[in-house]
């Protein structure tokens, strides 16, 4: 199975950024790819998405999420709740092993494989193997610097990559 990644997102005011590393690990012990793109803009560039977990599962969920955005005219909150509901109830989707962070200029959500939707109180989220390190770094940077969300997300991922063996420094940062 391919997995292991780190995604971090930071929202300050109406600015939001998401960053992901590029490493894809196969079977816990082999780097298969070093420059994968695990973050993207969807819905005409108005929504950011980052995913971690099984690659095929994450892509499937991202596609489902895009469908929900289209059905709900870009309403992020409604789309993410409907995705989570479908994820929990569908026998096939329920088996997918992935996590997603989705964000726009108004909201930032983490959607879990068990169908949970969480909007972090501090507008900072991180998922994947290096998630705890990236989250701690991002929180420290938000509290102690005046950096922009994109700079915070990138720096937090760099810190995570220096600690987590499943995270690398080939970082993609997207912002709104």
Curated annotation (Swiss-Prot):
Which positions bind Na(+)?
Answer: 161, 164, 167
Q: Which UniProt keywords apply?
A: Allosteric enzyme, Cytoplasm, Hydrolase, Metal-binding, Protease, Sodium, Threonine protease
Q: Which reaction does it catalyse?
A: ATP-dependent cleavage of peptide bonds with broad specificity
Q: Which GO terms describe its biological process?
A: proteolysis involved in protein catabolic process
Q: Which GO terms describe its cellular component?
A: HslUV protease complex; proteasome core complex
Q: What class of enzyme is it?
A: hydrolase
Which segments cross the bilayer? none
* Superkingdom of origin: Bacteria
State the InterPro entries in the record.
Answer: ATP-dep_Prtase_HsIV_su, Ntn_hydrolases_N, Proteasome_sua/b, Proteasome_suB-type
Coiled-coil blocks: none
One short Pfam family name for this protein? Proteasome
Q: EC number(s) of the enzyme?
A: 3.4.25.2
Care to name a GO molecular-function term for this sequence?
Answer: threonine-type endopeptidase activity
- Compartment list: Cytoplasm
Q: How is its activity regulated?
A: Allosterically activated by HslU binding.
- Identify the catalytic residues: 5
Assembly behavior: A double ring-shaped homohexamer of HslV is capped on each side by a ring-shaped HslU homohexamer. The assembly of the HslU/HslV complex is dependent on binding of ATP.
Q: What does this protein do?
A: Protease subunit of a proteasome-like degradation complex believed to be a general protein degrading machinery.
Q: Which family does it belong to?
A: Belongs to the peptidase T1B family. HslV subfamily.
* PANTHER family in alphabetical order: ATP-DEPENDENT PROTEASE SUBUNIT HSLV, METALLOPROTEASE TLDD
Q: What protein name is recorded for this chain?
A: ATP-dependent protease subunit HslV
Q: Which gene encodes it?
A: hslV
């Amino acid at each position: 199975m391919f997995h292991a990644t780190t995604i971090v997102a930071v929202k300050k005011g109406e600015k939001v950024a998401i960053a992901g590393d590029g490493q894809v690990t196969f079977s816990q012990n082999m780097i298969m790819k070093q420059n994968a793109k695990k973050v993207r803009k969807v819905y005409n560039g108005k929504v950011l998405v980052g995913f971690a977990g099984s690659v095929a599962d994450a892509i499937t969920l991202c596609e489902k999420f895009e469908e929900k955005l289209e059905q709900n005219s870009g309403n992020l909150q409604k789309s993410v709740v409907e995705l989570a509901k479908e994820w929990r109830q569908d026998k096939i989707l329920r088996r997918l092993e992935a996590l997603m962070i989705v964000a726009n200029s108004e909201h930032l959500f983490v959607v879990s494989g068990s169908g949970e939707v969480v909007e972090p109180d501090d507008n900072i989220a991180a998922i994947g193997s290096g998630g705890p390190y990236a989250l701690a770094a991002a929180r420290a940077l938000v509290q102690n610097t005046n950096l922009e969300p994109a700079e915070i997300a990138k720096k937090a991922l760099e810190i995570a990559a220096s600690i987590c063996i499943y995270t690398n420094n080939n970082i993609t940062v997207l912002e709104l």
